[in-house]
């Protein structure tokens, strides 16, 4: 019997405020609602899904380190850390787990400081501007990538 594939979904700072914070940019769904949809999608594909949201950079880095050898794919919305965190980039490169970067809003249509990502050039893909559905698309792509490896 083969072990189930495992996908880790990481969400960065302030995403715990989804549903309340700037709904014109981020939509009205809460993070809990988004994660529930992802869990259902993963279960249907016989995939284990883990989730962590943190406002602390070091907690996200620790989760990435702990994923080594245990997680097959990462979906990450680094939020504001996108534009500032070389440490997150280094952690992802260090564990060499494939990842997709997700953003609810179109970061390229917003303030200039949001246009640069420290992760995008190393990601398997980047999804932005599609709201909460972007997570579903990222999970579908991750599942397809894992199935192709089997």
Swiss-Prot record:
Catalytic residues (positions): 26 (proton acceptor), 103 (proton donor)
Molecular function (Gene Ontology), one example: 3-dehydroquinate dehydratase activity
UniProt keyword terms in alphabetical order: Amino-acid biosynthesis, Aromatic amino acid biosynthesis, Lyase
Origin organism lineage: Bacteria, Pseudomonadati, Pseudomonadota, Gammaproteobacteria, Vibrionales
Subunit structure: Homododecamer.
The EC number(s) this enzyme carries: 4.2.1.10
Protein name, as recorded: 3-dehydroquinate dehydratase
GO biological process, one term: quinate catabolic process
A Pfam family the protein falls into: DHquinase_II
Source species, domain of life: Bacteria
InterPro entries from the UniProt entry: DHquinase_II, DHquinase_II_CS, DHquinase_II_sf
Record-marked site positions (Transition state stabilizer): 21
Pathway linked to the protein: Metabolic intermediate biosynthesis; chorismate biosynthesis; chorismate from D-erythrose 4-phosphate and phosphoenolpyruvate: step 3/7
Disulfide bridges in this chain: none
